[in-house]
Amino acid sequence: MEELLSASPLLLEQKMKWINVNEQYLDYLRKVEKRIPRTDYGEDRYKPFFGILFEKDGLYYITQVSHAQPRHNKLKQQKDFYKVYDPKSPTRLIAVINLNYMFPIPKSEVFPFEKNQIHTYRTFTSEKEKSKYIDLLDIELSAINSMDIGTKAKELYSLKCNKPEHVVSKRCIDFKNMERLALQYKGEEKS
């Protein structure tokens, strides 16, 4: 299994980055798996994906953060659920990562997330609101990059593939089926 998840040396050293994903590809996956996250939640709401968690068979695995909710404070971190705390205020929960919702994407469907173009992704009531949102994204990404989340993603992938009956595995998206769909989508694009 380890050789299946080996990343190129470049990816091993790469820090996580915010990325955009072709919405048509996401809709394609959602026809089969309703838990594929959304980026667009209306004019004033937007959540980019991040990655690259790891690469497998020419596909990138990516995921997304979710806004912290009061109920998240009571939940324990597990192999598929991680809390993201503000590095400057270590008790302040700012986001959570549901790794069980990570999924594969053809490399051709990943696009850079440009902070200076944030106004094209969502609306803001003021420059101050826009600046605060960009600051939050920077803080979240800094925290994520301190968590070794790529290694944790590979471990979860291995658990799901090797022990599908494990309680954590049952909460995960069917990674193998998503890989099949991703490769199928890639093939349809070439036609």
Mark where each language-model region is.
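Residue-level detector of flexible, active-site-proximal loop/helix-junction positions
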Residues: 25, 69, 109
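Positively charged N-terminal leader segments that act as targeting/secretion signals
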Residues: 1-9, 72
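Surface-exposed beta-strand edges and their flanking turn/coil or helix-capping segments
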Residues: 32-36, 75-78, 109-120
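Arginine residue identity/basic-tract feature
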Residues: 30, 35-38, 45, 71, ...
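Compact nucleic-acid interaction/catalytic patches
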Residues: 42-45, 55-95
